[in-house]
Amino acid sequence: MKPPAACTGDALDVVAPCSAVNHLRWDLSAQQIAELTTELIEQTKRVYDCVGAQEPQDVSYENTLKALADVEVSYTVQRNILDFPQHVSPSKDIRTASTEADKKLSEFDVEMSMRQDVYQRIVWLQEKVQKDSLRPEASRYLERLIKLGRRNGLHLPEETQEKIKSIKKKLSLLCIDFNKNLNEDTTFLPFTREELGGLPEDFLNSLEKTEDEKLKVTLKYPHYFPLLKKCHVPETRRKVEEAFNCRCKEENCAILRELVRLRAQKSRLLGFSTHADYVLEMNMAKTSQVVATFLDELAQKLKPLGEQERAVILELKRAECEQRGLAFDGRINAWDMRYYMNQVEETRYRVDQNLLKEYFPMQVVTRGLLGIYQELLGLSFQLEEGAAVWHEDVALYAVRDAASGKLIGKFYLDLYPREGKYGHAACFGLQPGCLRKDGSRQIAIAAMVANFTKPTPDAPSLLQHDEVETYFHEFGHVMHQLCSQAEFAMFSGTHVERDFVEAPSQMLENWVWEAEPLLRMSQHYRTGSSIPQELLDKLIKSRQANTGLFNLRQIVLAKVDQALHTQTAADPAKEYARLCQEILGVPATPGTNMPATFGHLAGGYDAQYYGYLWSEVYSADMFHTRFKQEGVLSGKVGMDYRSCILRPGGSEDASVMLKLFLGRDPKQDAFLLSKGLQVEGCEPPAC
């Protein structure tokens, strides 16, 4: 396929000189965090006061739009220094101080977003300035500020504005508390070795012990997922699954009810019928009806596949109960799902996950992953020895453009769990790559935070294949942050439409299902041998194992999210239980409240969880149309991808970027085929 002409340009901003400074620091005490928070608020407010005091005739690009853009750059960096430690600091005092800083700064963010005087100056500027006199991205920035002002109700009566401001402040604090509760949860369950039957020795040996010599199983991912997949004792799985979905049940249940109520109230004040419609106005989908149709149609297509998969699982369960002398209850329980889905992979596809992970030691995976990304995107990574970091496990890398040697950014890797740390895997943008006040380009800096199994004195960290996939995905977000060359902080990195933001990373997950990349990031941890070809072939074929059930569960989560944000009276636990039964065909465990543990609902994905599936339409199309056709390790396609999809950040609409990269409008064919569904006139290898 001939590459789109628009993708052939330079992937770097060659005009602006680059400032190589890392402005981040991680040595602040709790007291310093508190003091600097107050200082940052005062400094930033002074700029807003200055903009808000301009007379109509004096308003200009320099004293209004550029002043706001410049303060956004410095404020974003300083804010991240103060509020990021709540997720990663080994010190509880620092985490607490950082959380308090986040609360104060979130309240301040609301105050600044509701500055009617500043909004009026932006409106005056728009009326005054000739649109073609602004650079395209500056014009987009101006339009975005006007749009955000209206979405904050700054065109409405003052009384309404005050109500909206009050609600926004409450929402910020509730979201922080919701996720803090989950991060700080230290629940563990004690079990005997017999109760943990089926789990490998390296897992059992890594567990801490209680005073009576029982093994401590926490509810963090490195314990929860392996246990649900491998433990053959149903009662143990039941206890752990139930505890996992009861985390922070009382406190987060109350927070979630209040979040939903306040979001609906705010959206009505702004003239939207539901919170979902308010949120989706800024996304590719635009309305809740479009999302509902997308999810309903996909569910209908996947349900027959889900029924077939449930029948297979039920038969596996019946046979195992007979073999182990256990009573067969004739149904699939929530705590059975991951266990038997894993068995499907091991029996139907003959993929032995315990054997497979021996080929994925962390150091080898990291070396291979970094090598692939460097080759694919024309980059060069270098470890910075002795860098200032927040914990000894953390590493910092410098990233350069391979062709020019120009520094474009840095990234931190924080890959292992510890108490009080953020419990999932995520990329945090810490220093936006954009233009500074003096016109120089600020390098982008991001952190990948994960919770992979930590090495012990006896064994290295060995990754499950799905953890390798997670690693690839989150590192894709890091690359999006670093390769973006936007002028404004507001459009830097992953600041794209929320239902597109996952697409660049999802597309890069495909590399962990292709033979050549897999061989490059694997090696047996003892013998150094490559994955046997037979095991590799089985792994690749297993990609569509359980695809019906897995994606139906994603639809359940997306529909719960939509229901809560379109029907304010919906009870979260009841709605989740209803959808589990109706769509997945597997009941939720009685007494649990999964939505109270669903961090996305309070983490910026409200009414937007559907975006994971929606984004996959584009990620599948990009991969199959370009990389699969022209070479999965093609540096040429990789550079087109970097130029068309990563370079713009949010300075272009996603639909424009996609059309440039694909050479046409996106299609659903590759997405549907990737789910194991038939597409008329389309064969899987060709689409």
UniProtKB/Swiss-Prot annotation:
Enzyme Commission (EC) number: 3.4.24.15
Subcellular location: Cytoplasm
Keywords: Acetylation, Cytoplasm, Hydrolase, Metal-binding, Metalloprotease, Phosphoprotein, Protease, Zinc
Residue list for modification N6-acetyllysine: K538
Catalytic residue list: E474
CDD domains: M3A_TOP
GO cellular component, one term: mitochondrial intermembrane space
InterPro entries linked: MetalloPept_cat_dom_sf, Neurolysin/TOP_dom2, Neurolysin/TOP_N, Pept_M3A_M3B, Pept_M3A_M3B_dom
Cofactor entry: Zn(2+)
Enzyme class at the top of the EC tree: hydrolase
A GO molecular-function annotation: metalloendopeptidase activity
Main subcellular location of this protein, as a coarse class: cytoplasm
Positions where Phosphoserine occurs in the chain: S172
Keyword rRNA-binding listed: no
Cofactor note (record): Binds 1 zinc ion per subunit.
Subunit structure, interactors included: Monomer.
Function: Involved in the metabolism of neuropeptides under 20 amino acid residues long. Involved in cytoplasmic peptide degradation. Able to degrade the amyloid-beta precursor protein and generate amyloidogenic fragments. Also acts as a regulator of cannabinoid signaling pathway by mediating degradation of hemopressin, an antagonist peptide of the cannabinoid receptor CNR1.
Homology family: Belongs to the peptidase M3 family.
Protein name stated in the entry: Thimet oligopeptidase
Taxonomic lineage: Eukaryota, Metazoa, Chordata, Craniata, Vertebrata
Record gene name: THOP1
